[in-house]
Amino acid sequence: MRPPGFLSRAPSLNRAERGIWSCSMDQREPLPPAPAENEMKYDTNNNEEEEGEQFDFDSGDEIPEADRQAPSAPETGGAGASEAPAPTGGEDGAGAETTPVAEPTKLVLPMKVNPYSVIDITPFQEDQPPTPVPSAEEENVGLHVPCGYLVPVPCGYAVPSNLPLLLPAYSSPVIICATSLDEEAETPEVTEDRQPNSLSSEEPPTSEDQVGREDSALARWAADPANTAWMENPEEAIYDDVPRENSDSEPDEMIYDDVENGDEGGNSSLEYGWSSSEFESYEEQSDSECKNGIPRSFLRSNHKKQLSHDLTRLKEHYEKKMRDLMASTVGVVEIQQLRQKHELKMQKLVKAAKDGTKDGLERTRAAVKRGRSFIRTKSLIAQDHRSSLEEEQNLFIDVDCKHPEAILTPMPEGLSQQQVVRRYILGSVVDSEKNYVDALKRILEQYEKPLSEMEPKVLSERKLKTVFYRVKEILQCHSLFQIALASRVSEWDSVEMIGDVFVASFSKSMVLDAYSEYVNNFSTAVAVLKKTCATKPAFLEFLKQEQEASPDRTTLYSLMMKPIQRFPQFILLLQDMLKNTSKGHPDRLPLQMALTELETLAEKLNERKRDADQRCEVKQIAKAINERYLNKLLSSGSRYLIRSDDMIETVYNDRGEIVKTKERRVFMLNDVLMCATVSSRPSHDSRVMSSQRYLLKWSVPLGHVDAIEYGSSAGTGEHSRHLAVHPPESLAVVANAKPNKVYMGPGQLYQDLQNLLHDLNVIGQITQLIGNLKGNYQNLNQSVAHDWTSGLQRLILKKEDEIRAADCCRIQLQLPGKQDKSGRPTFFTAVFNTFTPAIKESWVNSLQMAKLALEEENHMGWFCVEDDGNHIKKEKHPLLVGHMPVMVAKQQEFKIECAAYNPEPYLNNESQPDSFSTAHGFLWIGSCTHQMGQIAIVSFQNSTPKVIECFNVESRILCMLYVPVEEKRREPGAPPDPETPAVRASDVPTICVGTEEGSISIYKSSQGSKKVRLQHFFTPEKSTVMSLACTSQSLYAGLVNGAVASYARAPDGSWDSEPQKVIKLGVLPVRSLLMMEDTLWAASGGQVFIISVETHAVEGQLEAHQEEGMVISHMAVSGVGIWIAFTSGSTLRLFHTETLKHLQDINIATPVHNMLPGHQRLSVTSLLVCHGLLMVGTSLGVLVALPVPRLQGIPKVTGRGMVSYHAHNSPVKFIVLATALHEKDKDKSRDSLAPGPEPQDEDQKDALPSGGAGSSLSQGDPDAAIWLGDSLGSMTQKSDLSSSSGSLSLSHGSSSLEHRSEDSTIYDLLKDPVSLRSKARRAKKAKASSALVVCGGQGHRRVHRKARQPHQEELAPTVMVWQIPLLNI
């Protein structure tokens, strides 16, 4: 039988003091009741909840999990339940629920109970036989004596020193925790809940004397003040061992492990107690985790009746703290009286139940429930909830009357210009902060305070707290900041430092706590305001009055937006301050650290705000949609909104003419695409936002949506810039080639293009017939026919450009329809127009990324370990585009060694976004055998990367480097350089290859070029080339003998074969070179040498590691930090590039070993920092991605990272970023529009005059004829000619595009004039939404799949292409 449970509470402590006695517990929440759907939630641990959903108070109370009735168990005979074997961990802890419990039919002498038996405890034990009394000795031990802690001896739990030891037949883990905000509302409930259970289970039905002994023992125990001190502070921790009903925990397997003895230690004695760290990661959720299986290392079943030193010391320290810090709490007397009345009533009910019938038991059960509800509603929510909120708010220091105002002293004389500018920026910081604090005070004083005092209340207390949640805490954070700021401002002229004040003030957890909860609640608060404005005119009138009374007429919404905008403002101010802080200034490093802190904080807040808004919008869409099934579909927890856009749907007829247009709203969710018509409900008040309803047009799975782009056929990517003579290579032919993907462009433009293609075909037939002529005619021969063909080809190119220009805002989607009668799939087409070209490009890229995320290979792409919300969200995970071998011949002996990426300038066009919109170049990959090397060139010119060339090299390739085109500064009007690109190496991009034999080879790298080696020369003493780096005028080679060779450019643009300078650094190989502004960083051994580019002298030296034998292998720079990796070990080190200070160490083995079984040794084999990620290739073949800031601050790792499930079968040898050149090469752009090589001379001759003729014709009659000859001739001759192409012209602006009636409607709606020049300008404004990263190694595998021996062909050199979403660009 069970003695009454005891609730022990800790005094009211602040967070720092709680950490002293809470056994270093990271998670201090007791097991909460299952919350209702809209139940109010508070989270003192700052865990990331679903933003925008925290505060919805419309739901009633729900019975806690511990108070629910157990499911009825089937009847069995005898005491079989007590003899049932204990379930093992492998059974997922299900035994506590599935073991049948015997229902007694009569009182019998019970058998001895196994302490590890599984017993289902119902509220009054009506389904259980009386717990047997094993022996008189055990009876004297204390079966009927109440205690402070229920101590299941097999688990080795702690017992108060003044209480006897018990031998219970069942147990549950001791819970040691601190109550959170919402738990305070449940603590008294647990008190009242579990006391009657204890009574009902402990009082024997045959003896009332035992009850008296219990009461007297309880009275003696309660007489000790140390044992009743907990009642003075009912707000703190609970030490409780009362078994919960329907508990999922296994009584025979406890969650605490013997740390000292490991698996062999079964004793929890004074010598082998628990360390306090054992409580670090255990919370009450462990019970639920047992249901899914706890790791065996955390389970223990062989314990003895001993005490732990740690828990004894913990108890003594806890009792001392209680005596020292105990304070009276309002309402304690009432709670005690209520508890005594309830206990007395429960004792009578239990006694009546034991002597009564089954009907009496049911009445008792109902009475207990009513008692619980009474305790919950009367004594708790009405009284303790408000005090609990006030207590939580008091955790923040009230500094309203303590902070001085920051005043900048008068400017002294003799300051430098930089000091003057810094003082002005400091003044901006002070003024900005003062205005911000005033805005926060206005929220509280002009809105919250009057609303709370208003009678009758227009906002309930609950809604008032929701609207102004955490504003006071944010104000207190900034009041503390103002204290530090005022102190620093007063001594500015002597200190001139501000960065450390920002770091100290905004790196505190309380700042992130307050802002995070404010941002998470913002959407809910705004929704409450909108709803109240619409339903209560008095509230709307109050807002109007306050706005009109304010000097700047700022609305409440604008004031509430200021906390969300605050950190971006800080970042801009600190960036200005940093720009005016010279290197070597003591404030420079603190400013960079402050930028890092603020950027990390702002990024988290922005992401949470975005997530909250998206989830809130999904809920609003679900409410406003007219389809019930879609409402349920949108309510799914795993579905989130990517974006919603207003577009104009265009309906065409069979001839390509516009029939009608209609405004639509297109919703892109992570797996569904929906199109709806927006219908607004008008409101009588213009200030009240009218509610919107959506009439659904269609919804389709996102994975089945295809965006059809003009010219998006396979293989056209390579030909789009160098179109061939023959029309089948033209982009326009795609419309006829694929009937199921017919492109529906502007009607007249499309028809003109079809006419041109028809005429080109006719001219081809005429050309053949002319060849059959017997006579020789001056104006009718093969040369004239070629002129006709060339002129038509130019017209086709121009017309395609016009269509692309018209398509800069057009999106054509192929969508799945219903199956036809034969069961075959059908498709329908929808054409939309966006309002700007940038929206279209962004939308198509979002579609491509969302579809990529739905692919099977990305369902389990990365393993993440959550770290208090600092993990990378799934929406930002790199997505695997694909993997491919990079060998032409099947020669598996080649192994990947290095790579270099050559970005290509390309004619950007918004109408042609593809999956590789940020990569249009070539990846050169070097592979090696033991004696020779091989180079494979992979093209990223179209949507599918492919190997375009592969050739061998005489020696093993150890390093590669891309050398861009040398920037030439020509005077305006100067003649072009007469040298050809084939002769001058600096006019074309090149790839430098360093080999083991000590040679450097220079290869030409440009589109369409085959293997062209421009140079080949040897290093001094033919020393092996380990690394390469370059500037525009110098090439540097790190050699195996510890030297760096510097080569200068020759007058013809090539590299001198003899080094300009050889810089000797040491005897160890120079494994890594890195250019940083005007210095070269060279790693030799464990040191980094900083070499001046101008003087070739060593300016500085960095010792990266003090241990002997640590050799630097890789370096990566970002902002003002440099990450350094070593050939052995798994540690990365971060150093400041200006002061060379050691800032951070990261061990990548930690996340890798969390995913991979065992503890395999690993090292870093490649390194890359890009777009907020530090990507690390490992010797085990897996990638590790760690989050880092993106601005010019310090790139420290800001959270635990991710480990890729996609891996190579060998070390990851390289990680490169595939970028695109954003600046266009105008010469190449012009060349790309030139006709093909045949007949090249005639085309070059005719290009200029033909363009002039077209331009002149475009100003006249749109039906004027086109001249296709090789000379202009006279206007009379041209007027006598005719053309079937009608209104065609060579001008960039087509008359059909501007004046045709069927096209005018859509362009009037879009208000977007179309021209090639404006198109080119818009292309520069468009922002990329993703980036490509390529890694290489041997083969490809999925981690955690069934291990099998890979085939030989699976070990071929392979690259994996990743696409990284850029959410914050």
Swiss-Prot record:
- Provide this UniProt record's keywords sorted from A to Z: Coiled coil, Disease variant, Guanine-nucleotide releasing factor, Methylation, Phosphoprotein
Composition-biased stretches, type Low complexity, lie in 83-100, 1279-1296
Q: Does the keyword Coiled coil apply?
A: yes
Q: Where is the composition biased (Polar residues)?
A: 196-209
Q: Which residues fall in a compositionally biased region of kind Acidic residues?
A: 46-64
Q: Give the molecular function GO annotations.
A: guanyl-nucleotide exchange factor activity; kinesin binding
Q: Which Pfam families match?
A: PH_19, RhoGEF, WD40_2
Modified positions (Phosphoserine) in chain numbering: 180, 379, 1287
Entry-linked SUPFAM superfamilies: DBL homology domain (DH-domain), PH domain-like, WD40 repeat-like
Q: Which domain of life is it from?
A: Eukaryota
Q: How is it modified after translation?
A: Methylated at Gln-1338 by N6AMT1.
Segments carrying the region annotation (Disordered) are 1-106, 184-254, 1226-1260, 1277-1297
Question: What is the organism of origin for this protein?
Answer: Homo sapiens (Human)
DH domain ranges (all copies): 421-608
Name a biological process GO annotation: mitotic spindle assembly
Report the PROSITE patterns cross-referenced here.
DH_2
Where is it found, in Gene Ontology cellular component terms? centrosome; cytoplasm; cytosol
User: So what does this one do?
Assistant: May play a role in developmental myelination of peripheral nerves.
The coiled-coil segments of this chain are: 304-355
**Residue list for modification N5-methylglutamine:** 1338
Protein name (database record): Rho guanine nucleotide exchange factor 10
Q: Please give the clinical condition linked to this protein.
A: Slowed nerve conduction velocity: Affected individuals present a reduction in nerve conduction velocities without any clinical signs of peripheral or central nervous system dysfunction. SNCV inheritance is autosomal dominant.
